[in-house]
């Protein structure tokens, strides 16, 4: 099935939003979890490192989930109707958990019950990725039933699907892996050796487990969504390239780090390699998923908006990007690159 250039641009924009949100959100949610885990180990300052990352980033992360919903609704109204109908309950759960987490993050820096609030924030941040990831297996087919023109999500099939559980495990471990890798880099810049060792160790543990869950996804996908599995096997070179970058990241964590005491590992190099790895893997998955948005009911073309509407929306997105990009760059430079902030220097 051929896909028009306009539809391909639109789906690429949405997939770009999804990828950016997935990476940022996993780091954000994971940082909240690690902040909770190391809360009672004040001598390590691991919680302080996590909070320095969380403080400015969770608000920005929430912006991208709004952008995904708006882009999906505007570019693909046909797909939005089906997804909105079947994901009403899980979507409401996600919004509730995001609201709870955001509220507790706001008050966690001021309230006397700081520990309790951070526990709640950390736990909710641990659950949200597990629910969010279920959108992917739902689009693979087999879980949506149509009765008298009404779409329904068969929850019993989801909770009995090995592929769905593989996705859940992958989401949780990826959250812990990416966040621990980022916080190791933060600790490296902040020159907090105890925190760096803790987060590096966590990355070395959670990384291979997340890869194992990725393998489980492929194995279970072969039985439950063979059309998608076959598509990914046709572009197996992208998966191989993804695995190579994962190995590079692992090697980077064992390279000598002369600029940081006697510690080993180059977390910045590892973080960049893992970012490339997830991009390559997501590209292979997205390419194989075409032309379906929701198999087999909704394709990219059947759910696409009118061409004239797309052109107007696309122009609007370009203008919005031009306006917002300087703000995101300023944010990155102030909080991600400013060593005075990371080290909490006066």
Swiss-Prot record:
Keywords in alphabetical order, please.
Cell membrane, Membrane, Sporulation, Transmembrane, Transmembrane helix
- Tell whether Cell membrane is among the UniProt keywords: yes
Q: Which InterPro entries does the record cross-reference, listed alphabetically?
A: Cyt-d_oxidase_su2 (IPR003317)
Per the record, the major location class is membrane
Keyword Cell membrane attached: yes
Q: How does it sit in the membrane?
A: Multi-pass membrane protein
Where does the record say this protein resides? Cell membrane
Indicate the transmembrane segments per the record.
7-27, 63-83, 87-107, 119-139, 164-184, 201-221, 236-256, 269-289, 312-332
GO biological-process terms attached to the record? sporulation resulting in formation of a cellular spore
Q: Which Pfam families match?
A: Cyt_bd_oxida_II
What are its GO cellular component terms? plasma membrane
Family that this chain belongs to: Belongs to the cytochrome ubiquinol oxidase subunit 2 family.
Please describe what this protein does: May have a role in sporulation. Can compensate for the loss of cytochrome aa3.
Which protein, by its recorded name, is this? Putative cytochrome bd menaquinol oxidase subunit II
Q: What is the gene name?
A: ythB
């Amino acid at each position: 099935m051929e896909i028009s250039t306009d539809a391909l641009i639109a789906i690429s924009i949405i997939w770009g939003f999804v990828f950016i949100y997935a990476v940022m959100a996993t780091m954000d949610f994971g940082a909240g979890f690690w902040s909770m885990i190391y809360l009672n180990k004040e001598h390590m300052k691991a919680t302080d490192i996590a909070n320095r990352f969380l403080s400015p980033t969770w608000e920005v992360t929430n912006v991208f989930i709004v952008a995904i919903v708006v882009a999906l609704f505007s570019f693909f109204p046909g797909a939005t109707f089906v997804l909105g109908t079947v994901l009403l309950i899980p979507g409401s759960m996600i919004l509730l958990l995001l609201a709870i987490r955001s509220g507790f993050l706001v008050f966690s820096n001021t309230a006397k019950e700081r520990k309790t609030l951070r526990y709640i924030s950390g736990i909710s941040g641990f659950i949200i990725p597990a629910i969010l990831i279920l959108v992917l297996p739902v689009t693979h087919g087999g879980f949506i039933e149509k009765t008298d023109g009404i779409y329904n999500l068969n929850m019993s099939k989801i909770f009995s699907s090995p592929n769905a559980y593989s996705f859940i495990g992958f989401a949780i471990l990826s959250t812990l892996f990416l966040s621990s890798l980022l916080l190791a880099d933060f600790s490296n810049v902040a020159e907090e050796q105890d925190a760096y060792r803790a987060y590096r160790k966590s990355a070395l543990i959670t990384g291979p487990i997340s890869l194992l869950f990725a393998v489980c996804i492929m194995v279970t996908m072969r039985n439950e969504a063979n059309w998608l599995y076959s598509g990914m096997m046709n572009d197996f070179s992208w998966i191989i390239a993804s695995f190579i970058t994962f190995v590079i990241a692992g090697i980077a964590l064992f390279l000598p780090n002369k600029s940081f005491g006697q510690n080993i590992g180059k977390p910045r190099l590892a973080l960049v390699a893992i970012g490339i790895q997830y991009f390559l893997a997501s590209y292979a998955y997205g390419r194989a998923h075409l032309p379906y948005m929701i198999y087999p009911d909704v394709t990219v073309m059947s759910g696409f908006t009118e061409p004239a509407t797309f052109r107007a929306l696309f122009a609007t997105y370009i203008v919005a990007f031009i306006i917002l990009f300087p703000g995101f760059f300023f944010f990155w430079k102030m909080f991600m690159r400013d060593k005075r902030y990371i080290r909490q220097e006066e």
